[in-house]
Each structure stands twice: as C-alpha cells, then as structure tokens.
Curated annotation (Swiss-Prot):
Task performed by this protein: Catalyzes a trans-dehydration via an enolate intermediate.
Organism expressing this protein natively: Maricaulis maris (strain MCS10)
Family: Belongs to the type-II 3-dehydroquinase family.
Name this polypeptide is given: 3-dehydroquinate dehydratase
Disulfide bonds: none
Active site as annotated: 24 (proton acceptor), 101 (proton donor)
One matching Pfam family: DHquinase_II
Domain of life: Bacteria
Listed pathway(s): Metabolic intermediate biosynthesis; chorismate biosynthesis; chorismate from D-erythrose 4-phosphate and phosphoenolpyruvate: step 3/7
A biological process term (GO) from this entry: quinate catabolic process
E.C. numbers: 4.2.1.10
Catalysed reactions, semicolon-separated: 3-dehydroquinate = 3-dehydroshikimate + H2O
HAMAP family reported in the protein's UniProt record: AroQ
Length: 146
C-alpha cells in the first residue's frame, strides 16, 4: 500500500473558523481535514493530518514524513516568514513538499511577502482557501511521478 500524504499545519490554524474569517474563511481545521481526506481518498490516497503551534514539533513531523509519507502538504502559517529551521527540514527530506496557504500572503502585510519554505518546497499554492489544500494534494501526487 502507498504511504499516506502528510498534511502538516502550523501555529494558530487550530483557530480556523473563528480567527479572522474575512482573511482565512469560515471553515474549521476539522472541516478542512475532512475535505482533504475525502479528496485524497477519491484519488486513492490516505492522509495523516496534523497541527501544531510548536516549531520543533513540525520539524519532527517533517523528519517523520521522510520515512512514513509519500508526500507532504504543508501550511507552516506564520512560521513561513520566520523559520530557517523549517526551511532546512523541508530541504532535508525526500518526499515532495507542497506549501499551501488559505490566504494570499503576497497581498497582505509586507512581512508576509517572503517565504522561507517556498525556497525549499516543490511548489506553493496560496490564496484559494480550501482549494489551496486540495490543489496541494493534487500537486503532491503529480510530483510523485517526477
């Protein structure tokens, strides 16, 4: 059986649905997880969906994905703009990593315009709400063939 796609989520994403719905939408993280699971299953894949507010835990999960995932869809949230350590962890693993964001980070505050993760990821999908995740799953699967 194919290894699962790991979908990793960074800080404050546990507050989705109530935190700044004008920016992030009204879906909860649980609803995003359910939609991702259905979408991946329709494509013949399972997912492992996780969220942490702690940088080190996300790094550990990326290391784990190197052995236990076929691909990673990663929303590092605010760590996108600050974490060289997450950049290095993404570079250190073999499975393709697709960076995703619900909001269009390039259209927000200037400090959100730079992504350390994009420098290491296979690709990035931003600004499409839930579709960012679903397209991220598609891109991750497509990347497996390359």
């Amino acid at each position: 059986m194919t290894q699962p796609i790991h979908i990793l989520n960074g800080p404050n994403l546990n507050l989705l649905g109530t935190r700044e719905p004008d920016v992030y939408g009204t879906l909860s993280l649980k609803e995003i997880e359910q939609a991702c699971a259905r979408h991946a299953r329709d494509l013949g894949y399972e997912i492992l969906f996780r969220q942490s507010n702690h940088e080190g835990e996300l790094i550990d999960w990326l290391h784990d994905a190197n052995v236990n995932a076929c691909a990673v869809v990663f929303n590092p949230a605010a760590f996108t703009h600050t974490s060289v350590a997450l950049h290095d962890a993404v570079r250190a693993i073999e499975p393709p990593v697709i960076e995703v964001h619900l909001s269009q980070t390039a259209a927000r505050e200037a400090f959100r315009h730079h992504s350390y993760i994009a420098l290491a990821a296979r690709g990035s999908i931003t600004g499409l709400g839930l579709q960012s995740y679903l397209l991220g799953i598609n891109a991750a699967i497509t990347s497996l063939g390359n």
